[in-house]
Amino acid sequence: STVRYKVGDVEYTRTAFASLADDVIILRIESNKKKALSFSLGYDCPEALQPQVSVKGAQLTMRCKGVEQEGIPSALNAECLITIKADGKVKAVAAEGNGSKLTVNDATAATIYIIGATNFVNYHDVSGNAAKRCEEMMKKALKKSYQQLFAAHVEKYCEQFDRVELNIPMTKASEAETDVRVKNFNHSDDLNLIALLYQYGRYLLISSSQPGGQAANLQG
């Protein structure tokens, strides 16, 4: 997804995607003026998950544990890593408790790499090493530029998405915003909306469930 917005006379572009090819969430932020991008980034996690946040180099780590369910203690634990590449100054700021952050100053563009993993292997095996999984995936992702990561993700996604086409001609009603199209559907000739929502459903399924993972209807 891509969002563009203005703050004063500076235009910012923010692009986010979860890569099917590299198991990393990428958030790219760009400004149309040099050195106009500054921000800080940290974790906000419910205390029930017993989060532990730490910084090492330019990497921010959070470890947490699953919560008890119906009197049964959780055997799950998770880890999340965040690393930032930017053309400005990237600094790790350690703080007490879970307030540690990464800061970016005087940048024009920044790429945020987010990796998450758990010790879950399957429904009767939780012997996985969340920390090792995260480290291996982050090491792999950092070898690629933003452009390489984006291209690899699109190529992998299209292997599935491009299998099916549904073409229904657009009408004047199809030019409206999507929420307006949905609201007016029963009283319009906007049959192209059927194709749009059909492909949206495919996008959701492809993005939420892949071979080796959990079925979409088992994800909460």
Language-model region placement:
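Aromatic-residue-lined binding/catalytic grooves and analogous aromatic/hydrophobic interfacial grooves
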Residues: 1-220
